[in-house]
Amino acid sequence: YSYDIVKDVPESHVITQVPHKSPAVQEMNPFVQQDRFSSVALDSQLNPIYTFENYCESKSNKLAFTIANAIVRHPEKQTFNPMFIFGPTGVGKTHLIQAIGIGMKEENPDLRVLYLSARTFESQYTTAVRNNKVNDFINFYQSIDMLIMDDVQEFAGKTATQNTFFHIFNHLHNKQRHLILSCDCPPSELDGMEPRLLSRFTWGMTVELSSPDYELRRNVFLKKALQAGVEIPEDIVDYVAENVKDNVREIEGVFVSLMAHSTALNLPLTVDLARNVLSNSVKMSRCQVTFGVFV
C-alpha cells in the first residue's frame, strides 16, 4: 500500500516552524500538535478479508490468536503492548495482525488504526527527509491510536529510520496506544537493529506463529472450499494436508490450482488430480512432496 502523508493531510493541518520567538505568537507543545490530525479522515489500509472469522485456529497458533482477541476485547489493558508476532513466511502473521485492526475498528469506528509494512514506513520517511517534512511525518504517526506494522526486520541497517520509529514508539506507548508488530524472527535474532529499539520490542508480548500443524492445514483447505461453495472429498483434503506442511499460502494456492484444473479441463476432483497439481506446484523429492517457503 502507498500512503502519502503530505497529500493526505489538509494544508490547514500542516505544522509550520516559527523562525523567531514573538510576544504575539504562542509556541505549541509538539505533543499537542499531533492532536490536530485527529480530525483528518484516515484510510486504515486494512484488507477486509483478514478477519478473525476467516482465521483458522489450531494448537499451532492458539496462543497468538487468543492474545489478539484479548487486545480487541480489552484495549484498555497494556499487558500485551506491544504485541510482537514472529514466524516464517506464509504462516498467517499478516492475517492475524490485520484482524486485530479490523476488530478494533468494528468496536470503535472512530479509532485511528493504521496498517503498513516497515518498508512503506521507511520509504515515507525517506520522502519526508527529502521534502523537509520530518516534523509532519512524526506528528502524523504520533496521532495514530493503533499502529500495526508488518515485517519490522526491514528496518535492519537503517539507523535513521530506526531512530525516528524509536521516538514514535515511545510516544505511542506512553500514551497507552497499541503497537502490533510482525517479524520473520524473534527480537533476539534481529541483526542490524538499535539495542534500545530491540528492547522495546520485548516490552509486551512476544509470540511465535509456527508452521501449521496437520489440523490447521486441513482447516485452511476446508475453509477455502467452504468459501468457494465447493465440496471436497475427504481423501483429497487429507492428501493435501499431509503433503503441504509448512506454508498456509501454499495450501490456499493448491486449492485454487486444483479448482482451476478441474473446471478448465472438466475433470472430477480426485486424489490423482490433486497429486498432479501438487507435482506442478511444489518440489517433488524421493516420491514425496516437499517445498520451500516462497516469498
What residues fall within each predicted segment?
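Loop/turn-to-beta-strand initiation segments
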Residues: L111-R112, S143-M146, K175-L181, M205
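Short glycine-rich substrate-engagement loop in P-loop NTPases that contacts/grips substrate
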Residues: K105, P109-M146, T159
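Conserved AAA+ ATPase "SRH/arginine-finger" region at the nucleotide-binding site
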Residues: E189-D191, G204-L216
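Intrinsically disordered, low-complexity basic tails and flexible linkers associated
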Residues: Y1-L114, R119, H178, D184, ...
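Sensor-1/coupling segment of RecA-like P-loop NTPase cores
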Residues: H167-I168, L172-E194
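Short regulatory helix/loop adjacent to the ATP-binding pocket of P-loop NTPases
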Residues: T126-R130, P187-W203
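Short conserved motifs of the RecA-like P-loop NTPase core
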Residues: E231-N243
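Conserved ATPase-coupling elements of RecA-like P-loop NTPase cores
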Residues: Q153-F166, L190-M193
